[in-house]
Amino acid sequence: MLGLGVLYRLYERRLLREVRGGTMPRHIGLILDGNRRYALELGLSDPLEGHRRGADRLEQVLDWLEELEIRIITIYVLSTENLSRPPEELHRLLSLIETKMRSVATDTKIHGKGVRVRAVGQLGLLPVSVQEAIRAAEEATAGYGNFFLNIAVGYGGRQEIADAVQALLLERSREGKGLPEAIAEVTPEAIGKY
């Protein structure tokens, strides 16, 4: 009887062939959701184990993207809504993010592939130690440009829209445009650049 590992690899190859038959995106986004539920469904005693297993898949995801020649990925890790989780759960989750970001900064695969890491979101909402770990990963990979790994932490849909609109209006103001003219340029396409 074939082991699950062999079956999984066969299934993965089949999916890869099917995906390659279509148009490839240049940028994909992954929302990391359901890790707690996954851990509970597996009967794991610690829900954080689901988050750990998800974080450990990062290298495999990067391998897939390299195979598919997709150069940009944004991973949505921690929304502003997640920041209102119970303190103990949040502390453990933030600790996991910090540990993962520190390992990304020194990961030989990340450096070997030339992956540039960049964090987006309201980083000021995070503990200083997590911010420092994120900065370390960004600084360690700043010179790379083969692949781009955006880590969204402290993000929220409404906040992102507000930030993008503010950035657009500020840029138009610097160009000498008045408020009515700048407002006229607020379109989904224009704010999508921010």
Model-derived features with residue positions:
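Flexible, compositionally biased loop and terminal segments
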Residues: 1-194
